């Protein structure tokens, strides 16, 4: 596998939005246990995926709690192809802070880094505070995919990482595959073609 076939992907967002859970659910779905998430200190995990018949290695990095102290350094962002910016759909503040995380990406990220906006914990329907249409509007303004996920049930987790991989594939490799994302838990798929 060439270096160009490795996609470095970061998970960022406020503390406790479910970044580690998403990472573990995606990379090891059969062994996913919520109880082990808090005890696990993850740096990064790998998973191979296929796009247009070509295999790519996703190297997915977790902040391992550094964001609590706002000590994410520029080295974390170095060489990143894509960033999943995560918030918790039941916690308005984590959504309000998404703009700050976008600024961090601009400040430290490489030019043209791909982004996907992820609203996690969509299984907690009764406690939902962040309206998906507001998040979708924001993502549309930025020209990036938006998707709601649940690391607990697994809903849309694979789709979120695949949307990220598709973005990187198109932006960095020059592939033409459009991201097809099902943004809200249970809504019909949506094709995104107008990414800058
Ligand atoms: N209901 C529900 N709970 C979730 C979901 N994802 C994560 N959680 C819970 O939310 C809490 C925080 O999850 P983490 O995966 O540790 O979140 P994090 O963003 O990595 O947190 P830090 O390590 O502080 O950065 C844990 O108790 C998880 O079990 C989800 O999709 N639904």
UniProtKB/Swiss-Prot annotation:
It is a lipid-anchor. It is found in: Cell membrane. A lipid is attached at residue 196 (S-geranylgeranyl cysteine). Disulfide bonds: none annotated. Pfam families: Ras (PF00071). Its main location: membrane. GO terms for biological process: vesicle-mediated transport. Keywords: Cell membrane, GTP-binding, Lipoprotein, Membrane, Nucleotide-binding, Prenylation. GO terms for cellular component: lipid droplet; plasma membrane. GO terms for molecular function: GTP binding; GTPase activity. The keyword Iron-sulfur does not apply. GTP binds at residues 13-20, 62-66, 120-123. The keyword Nucleotide-binding applies. A motif (Effector region) lies at residues 36-44. NCBIfam families: small_GTP. Belongs to the small GTPase superfamily. Rab family. This is Ras-related protein RabG1. It comes from Dictyostelium discoideum.
């Amino acid at each position: 596998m060439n270096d160009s076939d490795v996609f470095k992907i970061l998970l960022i967002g406020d503390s406790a939005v479910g970044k580690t859970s998403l990472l573990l659910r995606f990379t090891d779905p059969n062994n996913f246990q919520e109880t082990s998430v808090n005890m696990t200190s993850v740096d990064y995990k790998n998973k191979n995926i296929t796009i247009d018949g070509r295999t790519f290695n996703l190297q997915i990095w977790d902040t391992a709690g550094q964001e609590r102290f706002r000590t994410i350094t520029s080295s974390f962002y170095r060489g990143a192809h894509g960033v999943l910016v995560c918030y918790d759909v039941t916690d308005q503040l984590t959504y309000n802070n998404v703009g700050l995380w976008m600024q961090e990406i601009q400040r430290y990220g490489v030019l043209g880094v791909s982004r996907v906006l992820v609203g996690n914990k969509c299984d907690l329907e009764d406690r939902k505070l962040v309206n998906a249409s507001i998040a979708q509007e924001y993502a549309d303004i930025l020209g990036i995919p938006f998707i709601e996920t649940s690391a607990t049930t697994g809903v849309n987790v694979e789709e979120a990482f695949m949307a990220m991989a598709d973005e990187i594939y198109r932006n960095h490799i020059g592939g033409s595959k459009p991201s097809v994302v099902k943004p809200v838990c249970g809504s019909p798929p949506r094709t995104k073609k107008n990414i800058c």
